[in-house]
Design a protein with these regions (language model features):
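Generic secretory/membrane-interface signal
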Residues: 1-2, 82
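Terminal beta-strand-rich extracellular "head" domains
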Residues: 33-47, 51, 56-154
C-alpha cells in the first residue's frame, strides 16, 4: 500500500467526503433546565429540582448521549461534594464526580454517559450530595439535562 503525504494543494482540492463513508444521525434532542438554585446538606444523593426528564427512545437500536451541562458548587464549610447521573432509578457509577475534601467555593462539572438498548419511557436525573462535614452542595441555576438520541453509523 502506497503512503500518500498530502501537501497544501492536495488538501485544498478536497471538497467533500466520498459517498461510501457511513455516518450516523441525530434522531431527537430533549432538554430540562434547572430554573432556580438548588442546594442540599444531605449526604445521600438527592434529586435536583428541574434536572429530571422522562424520555422514550424511538428505536432500541439507537444510542443516547445523556449529560448535564452545568456545575455544582461547595458551600463555605469544610467537606466535600458530589454529583451523579441516574437512569431509570439506578445511578450510573461511571458518571460520579466527587471531591471529598473540596476547597471553599470549588466548582465541579456533572458527568456524561452513553445509554443504549432500552425501549419504553425511562427517567433521567441529575443528583447531588454534600459529604459529611459540609453544610451544603449547590447546583447552579441554568444547569441543563440533555438527551441526544442518535443512530450509530456502525
Amino acid at each position: 500500500m502506497a503512503i500518500i503525504k498530502p501537501n497544501n494543494n492536495t488538501i485544498s482540492a478536497i471538497t467533500a467526503l466520498p459517498a461510501a463513508i457511513p455516518t450516523g444521525k441525530v434522531v431527537a434532542v430533549s432538554t430540562a433546565e434547572q430554573t432556580s438554585g438548588f442546594e442540599t446538606n444531605n449526604s445521600s444523593y438527592t434529586d435536583v429540582t428541574g434536572l429530571s426528564l422522562d424520555y422514550t427512545m424511538q428505536s432500541s437500536s439507537n444510542k443516547i448521549i445523556f449529560t448535564v451541562h452545568g456545575d455544582i458548587q461547595r458551600g463555605s464549610q469544610d467537606g466535600g461534594i458530589g454529583s451523579v447521573l441516574e437512569f431509570d432509578g439506578s445511578e450510573i457509577t461511571e458518571t460520579k464526580v466527587e471531591d471529598p475534601a473540596a476547597a471553599d467555593n470549588l466548582y465541579l462539572p456533572y458527568g456524561s454517559a452513553i445509554v443504549d438498548g432500552y425501549s419504553g419511557s425511562k427517567n433521567f436525573k441529575g443528583k447531588i450530595r454534600s459529604v459529611p462535614g459540609n453544610s451544603k452542595c449547590i447546583s447552579r441555576t441554568g444547569s441543563t439535562l440533555t438527551i441526544i438520541e442518535y443512530t450509530p453509523w456502525w
